[in-house]
């Protein structure tokens, strides 16, 4: 893939930005109609009951629950008064559970109330809805209530045994069924009409949440989803809290999970081809992969076996046809992510080998290919994959599918192979391999996903000798807009075993250019990679970051830059901290007035630095000693 004489389509290339990891983004190549994943069921759907098929919630009742919820939020977090208030409110909820669940405003309030509810009141509300489960589950508002009730299980299952003992002692006011029995009852109801619930616009959301609860794992997508009219505090949940969360469940839950999952096998064709039902199977694969891996493998084999015997393809396996289909390709993406390495290797050899370039060029099939690359963990699989894709990296970028290239680079990082080769191919694809003076410009090109000529506005005729890199020209140009995928590419490269070329390019950036990178929502993560990569030594890190001198105040007064500065500060030695504090101290008042800067000033203890330097140095020295001690413990 050398440069040689340049064909017209290579000169002055601007690579399409490509899609984000979610589909349907501009330039992603993934068609929009019918592909958008909705965080909540749509406001209308085929399952909506008739207007008069459920009780009406009066304005007076709505007003009561609104006032009750407001009072509950203002009440102390603990104490008998609060417990009594919750008990009384949930008693009223129990009498109007169905009306609340099927009212838009009422269902939002009920979702919040369920978050406050102890075990027994929630069970009574659930029992009140039991005779109308189908109505609630397939209602555009009721579905949220059932999801919220199910998502209380991680909180309540631990207290179930304790409250059951209290109930036996009290001998009154207890629910007729335990929480475990209610969940199993819902699972039995769903299992009896599995196709109906899975194929319903709203009911499928209940199935997906139920699968997670039965498996004792709440997936990231569920935890990150906003629920109703949550308070602002609830919506400020840190990102690190939105990862898959596991919790203990009874053995009966896992047994029922296996029963539900067996239902997929009975009508596998429906779950592969129907857009709504397919989402349920995708969630099942994720949960089973974590909790019942053998059954997950069995389900994956059923999907692959069905697809590989349907249709015909003149250019290879019938599976290739389904990789190009909007619905089945999504399911196959999930299959690729959960397959064990030996099965993934055999799937590649039997169905995909020799077809990767075609898949990379396809507007839909390139996404399953990205998932295949994300799943590569062995040199045995990476070797043939790299051999197929390496000759066409520039063409794939030009087609607007940079996600394929980034996924391949990520596989090289993960496996620890072909790193030097893929970097050389990237330099050639972005037209900065030759002359060698251009290589120092690779970071802005990778970050913006632009070829050299486009980024610097050059016009080169076909067959012309590429011009040498002009340092003055590069220094005068402001850093272009950093793309998300460009940032991911640089993060992968910085975690390569030898990231020297990328670090030299970063070191060649001027202070304002490096500042722009740190202030960018996507680019700030490149600085994170510099600070955290085990391949970047302290000396190399300091050489890059020294260009930020003179930019610390602007960095501190930026949303993303302030976070980068905090990270730099955390790892800085005492001498570097003095330099940072001295520069910030010159603009102390500006920092204090800035919404981001005043947090940095507090973190740096800037007032102490300016007024009591000796005390500040003692404090920072003690912090440095504790950090060194902790690092030595962690290294041991």
Curated annotation (Swiss-Prot):
Gene name as annotated: NOP9
Indicate yes or no for the key word Transmembrane helix. Answer: no
Q: Which residues carry this modification: Phosphoserine?
A: 7
Which keywords has UniProt assigned to this entry?
Phosphoprotein, Repeat, RNA-binding
Classification via SMART domains: Pumilio (SM00025)
Q: Which InterPro entries match?
A: ARM-like, ARM-type_fold, NOP9, Pumilio_RNA-bd_rpt
Q: Tell me the protein family, please.
A: Belongs to the NOP9 family.
Q: What is this protein called?
A: Nucleolar protein 9
* GO MF annotation terms: RNA binding
Cell cycle: present as a keyword of the record? no
**Pfam families, per the entry:** PUF_NOP9
Which GO BP terms sit in this record? endonucleolytic cleavage in 5'-ETS of tricistronic rRNA transcript (SSU-rRNA, 5.8S rRNA, LSU-rRNA); endonucleolytic cleavage in ITS1 to separate SSU-rRNA from 5.8S rRNA and LSU-rRNA from tricistronic rRNA transcript (SSU-rRNA, 5.8S rRNA, LSU-rRNA); endonucleolytic cleavage to generate mature 5'-end of SSU-rRNA from (SSU-rRNA, 5.8S rRNA, LSU-rRNA); ribosomal small subunit export from nucleus
**Where along the chain is composition biased (Basic and acidic residues)?**
45-57
GO CC terms on record? 90S preribosome; nucleolus; preribosome, small subunit precursor
